[in-house]
Every structure is written in structure tokens, then in C-alpha cells.
Amino acid sequence: MGCIKVISVFLAAIAAVDARAFFHNRGGNDVIPNSYIVVMKDGVTAEDFDSHISSVAATHSLNKAKRGSETVGHKDSFNINGWRAYNGHFDEATIESILKDDKVNYVEHDRVVKLAALTTQPNAPTWGLGRVSHKAPGNKDFVYDSSAGQGITIYGVDTGIDIRHPEFAGRIRWGTNTVDNDNTDGNGHGTHTAGTFAGTTYGVAKKANIVAVKVLSAGGSGSTSGVIKGIDWCVTDARSKNALGKAALNLSLGGSFSQASNDAVTRAQEAGIFVAVAAGNDNRDAKNSSPASAPAVCTAASSTIDDQKSSFSNWGTIVDIYAPGSNILSAAPGGGTRTLSGTSMASPHVCGVGAAMLAQGVSVAQACDRLKQIGNAVIRNPGTGTTNRLLYNGSGR
């Protein structure tokens, strides 16, 4: 599980920091060597933060000169609604020094984050839209409020989006890229999820505006710090465009437990962005995955066409709602379509319905609770302690 946060918070809280325990108890094979995320305590000022960064830079330079370390030091700083953190590439001596600073809340190892999609099935039926707009299964028509997310901005934090795809014509722009220098979707995952949350044909919120935020490579992987950097950008962008309270964010990705990842999405939600997250595809308790385990966000598990839990879907008390995730047809780069399965496909259904609710006047703070309230209690064998509620858009059908 690799839950470093518990260890690092404890280490940061005691007077004599046993940094050896931190390095020894890394856990998992997803740790990025010598890469860390440092989170400051609440209340640390901008001046204190800058002073800390300067001190870390000096310490890193000194240690690098002494030991010939090839680490590069501080990389990016984050400020998500007052949550201050940074990531970097440091040797152990520098991390030991960082852990001793009383302004530091915790340090955790940066880890690999991957998309949450599984298989492709050619010519599978398009069933998700009909299912989320009817109380009974088997309906092919999608019934929805005509506002359809109009006036809402949805950030697709993923592998990028094919912004030239006709599904998004006139409603999409490229945002930022935290993983490479290729501002395209070389994987297809991000285009597919965007097609579900806001595509003209395959989407739920058909009139919402879309922003492509690339945090995963064409191979479908990235880092926790790269995802946090993308989320930070989204909050800053929404604030600059007066879109807080009128924005949603889809995260069809995840990794092992990360308190920093959970903190970042929580602050984004608190800032005024509805956040939908994939529960994960390991058929295990989602409490062990991030950012799915963040209580503040709307965590989506995956259902099948016959209202059962998808065999791969994570479950648990942290799951807020089930949504269609098996064999979902949506957009593919180059103007085509593709069928994918995964909680990655469930999350954008939730994101789209959430965005549509925001357009109807439901607040960001109330949106997930509203989805849980009106969801249909139809999922069979949802998993131990897991809701049996299936996503419903309240169409009345």
C-alpha cells in the first residue's frame, strides 16, 4: 500500500526525527527514486515558504558539493487554495534537514500515477447515457435538462485531449502540460473521458466548456507531483476566469495512497471545483488508493450494463456512487471512437452529471451529496460496506 503519509507525519511531529525510518519504510514499487513531495503546515506565509525554499536550495547545493549527488533539487511549488507544497529531487541528507523544519507538515515519496482504464471491446453498445437518465435499465434514449452543463468549465486532467475532435468543436481549449512537451493525446484515454463528460454525441454535459490538462504520458503514466501541479493550474485558471463555483474536474487516474494527492484535490474542491475521481481497478478497498480515498471528492465505482459491480472495480465505504464503466463507447483521437472499460469511464459520467447540476444551480459543496441522494439503489453485490446507488441525472424517467 505504501502509505508514507502516516509515517512522515509522525516523523515530522516528534522532536528527534528518525529519518532512517522514513527511507526504510517507502513501501511499494511505484516510488520514484530520490523524488519527494514536501507539504507545509497550514498558516505558513508566502514569505516563510520562500525562505524555506531558499534554505532548502542552499542545503541541497552544499550536500551536492560534498557528496557529488546527481539530484536536481527543488522543481515546482504549489499553492492550491492556501495549501502550500513543493516537489523536488533530493539526496537523503537534504530530506533529513527538511524533516527537521517545524514549518513542514509532512514529506512523502513521489510515486507513479496511472490511468484507470482496462480493455477495449470493438463494436460494444453505447448504454451509459441511457442508463444514467432512467431509473430502469434497458433504455437507449438519453434524457437530460436542456442546459446540459452550459456555462460550466470541465477540466480533463488526463493524457491530454484531441482538441480538434468534432465532439468538442467550439467548446475546448488546451490548458497545460506537466508531463512532457507533446500537447496531444498520444494515448486516447483523455479524449475518451472528455467525450463522456462533455462530448456532443457521447457526453453527459454536452454544452460545457472543456479544458485539456495533460498530466499523464502517451504510455498512461505520470507522477503524483505532476498531477498536483495540474490541479494547482486548474484552480489558478478557474480563479482567473471567475469560474470557481462553476467548474468541475475529472480525475480518471490514481495510484497508491498519497496524503499529498488527497490534500490537493480536497483544496480544489474547497476552492469551488466539483471533483470526480475514479475509484480504481484493483477490485480492492478504494481507501488504499489516491486521490480516490479523499473524503471531499466524489469517488466513482464502475457498474455493468446489468447493474452489477464491474469485476475490476474498487469498492469500499469511500465510494460515493456507482456509474457506467464497462464497455463505454466514446471519442478517440483523430475523430474516431473507441470502447473502453474501467472506473476511468465511470468517473466522467459522474463529472458530467455533476457539471449539469452546477448549471442548474446546485452548489459545488452540495453536488456529490445530491447525486448520492437521488441515485438509484440497484447495484447488486456492490462490495463490503459499499453503496448500491447508481448514478442518475434526475430526469424523472
Swiss-Prot record:
Keywords from the named record: Glycoprotein, Hydrolase, Protease, Secreted, Serine protease, Signal, Virulence, Zymogen
Compartments it resides in: Secreted
GO CC terms: extracellular region
Top-level EC class: hydrolase
One annotated GO biological process: proteolysis
Xref: CDD domains: Peptidases_S8_PCSK9_ProteinaseK_like
Expression induction: Expression is up-regulated during infection.
GO molecular function, one term: serine-type endopeptidase activity
Maturation propeptide residues: 20-116
Listed EC numbers: 3.4.21.-
Record has Secreted as a keyword: yes
Record-linked Gene3D superfamilies: Peptidase S8 propeptide/proteinase inhibitor I9 (3.30.70.80), Peptidase S8/S53 domain (3.40.50.200)
Glycosylation sites: 250, 393
Signal as UniProt keyword: yes
Record SUPFAM superfamilies: Protease propeptides/inhibitors, Subtilisin-like
Record InterPro entries: PCSK9_ProteinaseK-like, Peptidase_S8/S53_dom, Peptidase_S8/S53_dom_sf, Peptidase_S8_Ser-AS, Peptidase_S8_subtilisin-like, Peptidase_S8_subtilisin-rel, S8pro/Inhibitor_I9, S8pro/Inhibitor_I9_sf
Domain Inhibitor I9, residue spans: 35-116
Domain annotation Peptidase S8: ranges: 126-397
Domain of life, per lineage: Eukaryota
Active site residues per record: 158, 189, 344
Family label: Belongs to the peptidase S8 family.
Functional summary from the UniProt entry: Secreted subtilisin-like serine protease with keratinolytic activity that contributes to pathogenicity.
Name of this chain's protein: Subtilisin-like protease 3
Provenance organism: Arthroderma benhamiae (strain ATCC MYA-4681 / CBS 112371)
Organism taxonomic ancestry: Eukaryota, Fungi, Dikarya, Ascomycota, Pezizomycotina
